[in-house]
Amino acid sequence: MFPGWLALTLLSVACLGTQDFNEELKKCFEDPQYEDLLQLARNGIGQTSVKKKIIVIGAGMAGLTAAKILHDAGHQVTVLEASGRVGGRIETHRVAGVTWFIELGAMRIPISHNLTQEFVKRSGLDLQEFYSNNDQTWMLFNGVRHQLGDVKANPDRLGYSVRDDEKNKTADQLFKQSLRKIEKELTNCKCSCRQVLEKYDSFSTKEYLIKVGNLSRGAVQMIGDLLNADSGYYEAFMETLRAYIIFGESRFDEITGGFDQLPQALSDALCPGTVKLHSLAESVEMSGDCVHVTYRTSDPLQPRARLTADFVLVATTAKAARLLRFQPPLSLDKQDALRSIHYTSASKVVLACTRRFWEDDSIFGGKSSTDGPARFIYYPNQRFSGDKGVILASYTLDDDSTFMAALDRDRIVEVVLDDLAAVHNRSKEELRALCPYSNVKHWGLDPYSMGGVAFFTPYQYMDYAQELSRPEGRVYFAGEHVDLPHGWIDTAIKSGLKAAKSIQEAVNLASTENPEHTKEHSS
């Protein structure tokens, strides 16, 4: 996840009760297939009458989900994973011999993401609440430092230059105010969701807030700073709106003991040897009713191997898919979609500390924020034995992440310690002594994902959303970039379920149209 990860999360919006949000607008972003897919996740697709060989490229949540469904249906499945672990953009950082851990990728699950919760439950894992907001945390903007609770009570404390009609409103309230025109179009003009989505697909987030939302530049800056939107203001407004609606959920959860347990449980549920790690797929050759996949192995005496299957599912990121050599080449439209879709950058900086110094401020969970390079600081919801603690000392996206990625690790830690000291009003040297261990993850530099999560720029929804999910002959595609909303484990799972269902439908259709040929080929 970001995956979808990660949860990967796209905005850090202050809590907005979903009951306060326009229900018609929320419905525009609901997937009409979702409940059917939830039943598929629970019951599977049944036993296939014709067993096929299927290769899945990529052992992230999309690939593992599809592999599990197809495996349970009776197909012979092989999963090729280029890296040395499963999970993709689910990555839990652990250190041998210690009990603490922290998420470098996906780290939260919205309460409405029932598919993810279903797979967590079926894997025998537990959930606990992830606290996104805490009134005791700090906000440091424009040289002014206040606790979140004080800013909620008086948003003008932060000193943004806004119009009189925008004063004493939170960034969240200002963003919601900008949506009035869309809400009116849905309710008064009887515009369809598709009409609204098509109309506003051309707007960047900043363009919409100024031209349609009629907000002042000061209000736009406030939204960008506090809601983590400024570094991606050039991205599509409809993506920002999708993220805003999700972050209005009443509750988020995390997997007790670490998110990496989920993909590992899916992998363990497959037959031994199904998932091949350190197996980088290089080429996909379609020939008649067969698909041949050539991949690298870890065996120096046989550096490359070849598998033949009836179907192939490409469950990598769009960027990683471009490294595959397809023969015959993919359609020009597919190539354009894979090449053009925008990915966010995302960076996380982890500090492990001998003492949970943030608890001196009565901070347990939640996040602090600043306009400094560190941007967002997340405090752990899980407590480990003793006084030790681990903190996500910086979480940045888009241009903020690119800034971090240009620095070497030591310089990054120095920059983050500067911001952490300012936010907590402590000396940098004290924090350096308290937090001697660090780790840095740049998803934009990851050689396997090659990016954080997909996030459309203007026009990309209309241009690429359907094309990204369209199969090419016997080659299918899955991943959080293939479905909506981008950047979530749930979306990766959803795309994997849809792909598995489509492959099974193709098997059924072939067996109906040409039963003798199907029977012979499947042997």
PLM feature segments, named:
Residues 19, 88-116, 134, 191-194, ...:
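Glycine-rich active-site loop/strand segments that organize a redox cofactor
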Residues 50-79:
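N-terminal Rossmann-like FAD-binding beta1-loop-alpha1 element of flavoenzymes
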